[in-house]
Amino acid sequence: EVAPNLNRLSEEGIFFTRCYANSFRTDRGTVSALSGHLALPTVSIMKMPTKSRTLPALSEEFLKAGYQTDFLYGGDINFTNMKSYLLSKGYQRLTADTDFSLAERNSNVWGVNDDITSEWLLNQLKERTDGPWFTTYLTLSSHEPFEVPYNRLEEKIPNAFAFTDECLGKLIDELKK
C-alpha cells in the first residue's frame, strides 16, 4: 500500500473522491487546485500574470474572512512565476527553499525534502497564536527523479509517494496531540 496514512485519514474527516487538480506539471496543478482553473495544455497560466491575477482563489476568500494566509514549498518559489501568482492571490507569508539551510536545500534535486518541510510546518503551527490561518503546503519529494531518503517500497515512484504519505501522516498525527 502506497498511502496508508492518507487512506487512514480519509476515514477521519471529509474526503472528496472527485476533486482533481488536473495537470501534468506542478505549477498548473497548483492553479487548478487553488483557483479552480483547468490547466492549459501548452502554457502555465502562472506565467501569464495579467490572466492569473483575474482568477479567484481560496486564499483570497480566507483572507477576506480574517484568516492569515501562508504558503510553504521546499522548492524555488520563483520557478514558473509562482511567487507572483501567490502574492496576487493574497498569500501574506511565503516560505520556500531559501528559508532553509544549504544542507536542507540540497536534500532533494528540487529543494528541501518533505520530512524537513513537514517538521518545519509542524513547529510553525504549534507556535501560532495569530489564528485563524489558512496554510497551503506544496510537497515536492514525489517529483521526478523520485529520490528520497526512504526505502519502504521497491519501486522508485511509489516509494517517493509513500515517503510523502509518511511525512503527511506524521504531521497530522503530531498536530492531533
Which residues make up each language-model segment?
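Solvent-exposed soluble domains appended to multi-pass membrane proteins
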Residues: 1-177
